[in-house]
A protein has these predicted regions:
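Residue-level signal for functionally critical sites in structured catalytic/ligand-binding pockets
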Residues: 2, 89, 147-151
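Exposed extracellular interaction/assembly regions and N-terminal maturation sites
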Residues: 3-120, 157, 161-182
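Short aromatic-glycine motifs in intrinsically disordered, low-complexity regions
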Residues: 1, 55, 140-144
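Surface-exposed receptor/substrate recognition regions of extracellular proteins
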Residues: 78-82, 95-96, 121-123, 130-158
Length: 182
């Protein structure tokens, strides 16, 4: 994603959106996500994974060129506050698992909740929330913790050490929380 160099607020009366083939990024192997390559895009994962796939979120940086630094902010700043990652599972994860974790050694944790839907029997709907104190992984196994086709999770770097999570996690069997400490 290109970085802009304009100064001042951006105003659009017609809205701002991304479109085209680069809007959806397909990932088939473990990857460290970056704001430039994955932020604001739909990350598509699913199907028969060759091995457990881990998406690693970048460490949240709110101190580089903060909002209090005034006009003329550096377009190449390392500050990634507000970057949003949308992970979508178009085909049920069938042979392994998907883990979405924060960078090892960082103090970044999840806050927020996902709605979990039992797709195979009762149609039960349950909300699971991250505990905000130790959960640094979202684990989707294709069954009880989600990862059935149609699952999506949106993750936003909302503040220092906090990734805000929302989404619909579709599972089968007795659904369980996808939030974990590893």
């Amino acid at each position: 994603m290109a970085r802009t160099t304009f100064q001042g607020p951006l105003r659009s009366l017609g809205g701002i959106y991304q479109q085209g083939p680069a809007t959806v990024v397909e990932i088939t192997t473990s990857t460290t996500l970056t704001p430039e390559d994955h932020g604001g895009r739909i990350i598509s994962i699913g199907g028969s994974l060759a091995a457990a796939l881990t998406l690693t979120l970048p460490t949240i940086n709110t101190s580089a060129n903060s909002t209090t630094s005034g006009p003329g902010q550096d377009p190449s700043t390392a500050n990634n506050e507000g970057v949003m990652y949308t992970i979508w599972v178009p085909t049920t994860i069938s042979t392994s698992s998907l883990k979405i974790g924060t960078t090892s050694g960082s103090s970044d944790l999840y806050v927020g909740a996902v709605i979990s839907i039992d797709s195979d029997t009762s149609g039960a709907v349950v909300a699971f929330s991250a505990n905000g104190s130790s959960n640094d992984f979202i684990n989707l196994n294709g069954t009880t913790t989600g990862g059935v086709a149609g699952t999506w999770v949106q993750i936003v770097a909302i503040a220092a050490d906090k990734y805000m999570v929302s989404g619909n996690v579709i599972g089968s069997g007795t659904v369980a929380t996808p939030f974990a400490d590893s």
